[in-house]
C-alpha cells in the first residue's frame, strides 16, 4: 500500500501517537496540494453491491481543509462480447462512476456539516451505483 502512496489508517481507539502521525501526514499532503482517495466505508468488499455506513474521517477532512468531495463508485459487470476473450472469465469488469462534487460549508458548525456531507455523499453514491434498496444507513451514529 505504501508503494502506491497509501497511508494506513490507525486505530484511533488504541494508538493516539499513530493517529497524530496520520494527521500530520495529511496536513503535509494538503500543503503539497495532493489528492486524497479514501474509502468512507473504511474497507472495500469486492462484489458487494450495497453501500455500508460511512465513517466520518473523509468528511471531516473535507471540512478541515475546505476541499470538495468527489464521490466515486466502483460497480462490477459480467464479461460479455469481446471481453470474454481477454482475462480470466471469472473476474468481472469494473465500471467507475464519478459523481458531482460536494462542497463543504465551513460557515456551519463542523459536526453538523460533517454529518450533512456524509448523508449527501451516501445518497449520491447509492443512486450512482443503481441501488434501489440499500439496507444500510449513511452512518451508525444516531442509530
Indicate where each model-derived feature is located:
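Membrane-interfacial amphipathic helices and adjacent loop/beta segments
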Residues: 1-31
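Non-catalytic C-terminal accessory region of glycerolipid acyltransferases
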Residues: 19-143
Amino acid at each position: 500500500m505504501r508503494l502506491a502512496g497509501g497511508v494506513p489508517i490507525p486505530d484511533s481507539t488504541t494508538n493516539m501517537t499513530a493517529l497524530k502521525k496520520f494527521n500530520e501526514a495529511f496536513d503535509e499532503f494538503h500543503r503539497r496540494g495532493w489528492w486524497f482517495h479514501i474509502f468512507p466505508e473504511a474497507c472495500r468488499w469486492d462484489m458487494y453491491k450495497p453501500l455500508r455506513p460511512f465513517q466520518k474521517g473523509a468528511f471531516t477532512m473535507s471540512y478541515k481543509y475546505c476541499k470538495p468531495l468527489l464521490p466515486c463508485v466502483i460497480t462490477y459487470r459480467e464479461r460479455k462480447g469481446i471481453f470474454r476473450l481477454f482475462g480470466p472469465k471469472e473476474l468481472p469488469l469494473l465500471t467507475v462512476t464519478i459523481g458531482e462534487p460536494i462542497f463543504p460549508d465551513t460557515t456551519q458548525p463542523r459536526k453538523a456539516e460533517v454529518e450533512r456531507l456524509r448523508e449527501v455523499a451516501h445518497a449520491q453514491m447509492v443512486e450512482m451505483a443503481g441501488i434501489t434498496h440499500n439496507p444500510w444507513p449513511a452512518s451508525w451514529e444516531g442509530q
